[in-house]
Structures are given as C-alpha cells and as structure tokens.
C-alpha cells in the first residue's frame, strides 16, 4: 500500500488510544498522514471471526482523529468509517476484500487507500457510494433468490391488469423469479459472447 512500516512517523505499531476511563489501550497499527492518525488497523488471527472485535475497534475509532478503520484477520479485510454519525464507527463495513477471492473491482477500490492516492475527503465519498451499492446488491440478491410480496407488486403494476391480491402475487412470484433469473443469464451470455 506504499506506507513505510519502518518509519514510525508513518506506521505506528501498538498505537496507544486512551478510551474514556480505559487508559493505554492499543490499536495494532495506526497509519499517520500529515502527522495525524488517518487509518487504524486491528489485526487478528486468521482463525478468529472478525465480528467479535467490532466493539473494540469502535472504541479506538471514537477516541482518535482517524477517519478510517480496518479490521482484518489477514485474509478478510473490512473497511469502516463514520458515515452514519460523526466520530462513531458504522456497524457495518463499507467495503470488504477477501484475499482468497479477489475481484478486479475490489482491487480498484483498494488502490484508493494507497499512500500516493490517499485523499480522506474523496475516500469518504467513495465509502458512501460503496456502502449503499453494497446494500443494493444484497437486497437485489435476496430478491432474486426469494422475492418478497412488495417486489412482486412492483412488477405486477406494469404487467397485470387485475388487482394485486395475495393470490395474484403468489401466482406471479415463480414467473417473475424465473424471468429475472433468465434475464440475468441472458445478459451474462451476451457479455461472454462479446468477449469471445
């Protein structure tokens, strides 16, 4: 990522963070930019589930001027910031990268954290976009697997002349689900054909 781990003014291991009445707590690493902590990194064992440490990172984040925090087990990296409320770490990461299954789009986003590219303000905007795009993909994935009634109603208003009763919703649910999945398959096939 371009940060000099041997420069104590740039990467500080075991950075001391005084949190309320708890003095001397330490975050594993703090990356400093212009003399201020910009990114906090809490590193855990690759065997540890990351969810158990979110509260710890939350405390560290609120006690510093850092705008970004990373929770990692060396395989999965979760990136956090304070989009919902200033100085309070969001509950969910705005970005995740899994080194065992890296996607090109994730690499492009990760490069924005490189020392030469780091810009806290623009990264904050990127974080907001990533957070909401991630949520849209989660919702869309869930709807494609098992569409809820409101999702079916959305289509019914344009394709069905009758009233959207529960029976109509139940009748159209498998049709709409199948059509959406066929549409996605067709789009993927077209992309593959164009690539060949």
Please provide the spans of the model-predicted regions.
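A short, conserved, highly charged catalytic patch centered on acidic carboxylates
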Residues: 1-68, 79-196
């Amino acid at each position: 990522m371009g940060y000099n781990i041997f420069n104590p003014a740039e990467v500080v291991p075991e950075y001391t963070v005084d949190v309320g009445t708890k003095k001397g707590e330490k975050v594993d690493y703090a990356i400093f930019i212009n003399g201020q902590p910009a990114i906090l990194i809490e590193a855990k064992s690759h065997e540890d589930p990351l969810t158990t440490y979110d509260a710890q990172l939350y405390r560290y984040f609120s006690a510093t001027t850092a705008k970004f925090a990373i929770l990692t087990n060396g395989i999965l990296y979760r990136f956090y910031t304070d989009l919902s409320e200033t100085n309070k770490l969001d509950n969910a990461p705005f970005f995740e990268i899994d080194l065992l299954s890296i996607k090109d789009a994730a690499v492009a986003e990760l490069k924005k954290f490189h020392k030469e590219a780091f810009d806290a303000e623009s990264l904050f905007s990127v974080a907001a976009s990533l957070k909401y795009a991630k949520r849209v993909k989660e919702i869309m994935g869930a709807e494609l697997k098992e569409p809820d009634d409101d999702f079916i109603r959305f289509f019914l208003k344009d394709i069905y002349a009758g009233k959207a009763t529960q029976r109509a919703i139940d009748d159209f649910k498998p049709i709409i689900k199948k059509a959406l999945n066929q549409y996605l398959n067709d789009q993927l096939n077209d992309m593959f054909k164009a690539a060949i």
